[in-house]
Design a protein with these regions (language model features):
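Glycine- and small/polar-enriched repetitive beta-structure motifs of secreted/surface proteins
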Residues: 1-189
Length: 189
């Protein structure tokens, strides 16, 4: 274990905490972001893009509790396993809260249009296998709440703003913003 910054804490085999006031507790955890704590196994939250668990990730003032999570951004929290919070081309990734397993919140992976990216913020998910991916369409993706499983915020239509969307249910493919999807399999008509 390596604690290499002021007030850093590292406990566990190959645990590393190099961000000020950060901590890595468990096996193979990596934390470089200031004020960020990771508890579990094989989680990563460095401040500079480095290859770790196959991902380039950053995190500041954030926290992870679980296993095999990746975390970017600022003021984000993850509880569970195999969750991904990844900035990609988004101009900001803040205030994301995930509770569950196999959830993804990210910007667009298309770097050819990254100058058109917006901010992703205010996303709250409780459940598993939910996906929120922003498209590079100059629109921010904000204030999305999901309670359920297997839901998708579908931003494939770049003309639509999917902000202010609430889903309470499972197996929903949300295609209209400023909307509430209530019940499993519900849709905008």
């Amino acid at each position: 274990a390596h604690a290499l910054a002021n007030d850093a804490l590292a406990i566990g085999t190959t645990a590393s905490a190099t961000g000020e006031s950060s901590g890595a507790i468990g096996t193979a955890n990596t934390v470089n972001g200031a004020g960020t704590y990771v508890i579990g196994a094989r989680n990563s939250a460095p401040t500079t893009p480095v290859a770790s668990n196959g991902s380039n990730i950053t995190a500041v003032n954030s926290g992870v509790f679980g296993n095999e999570n990746t975390l970017d951004g600022e003021n984000n929290r993850v509880t569970g396993n195999s969750n991904i919070v990844k900035k990609e081309t988004a101009t900001g990734l803040t205030d994301i809260m995930l509770t569950g397993n196999n959830n993804t919140v990210s910007g667009d992976t298309d770097t050819t249009t990254q100058d058109d990216a917006g901010k992703v913020s205010g996303i709250t998910i409780t459940g598993s296998k939910n996906t929120v991916k922003a498209k590079n369409n100059t629109k921010n993706l904000t204030d999305v709440q999901i309670v359920g499983n297997n839901n998708t915020i579908d931003t494939s239509n770049k003309a639509l703003d999917l902000s202010n969307t609430q889903i309470l249910g499972s197996n929903v493919n949300a295609t209209m913003g400023n909307s509430v999807y209530l019940g499993s399999g519900s849709a905008y008509v």
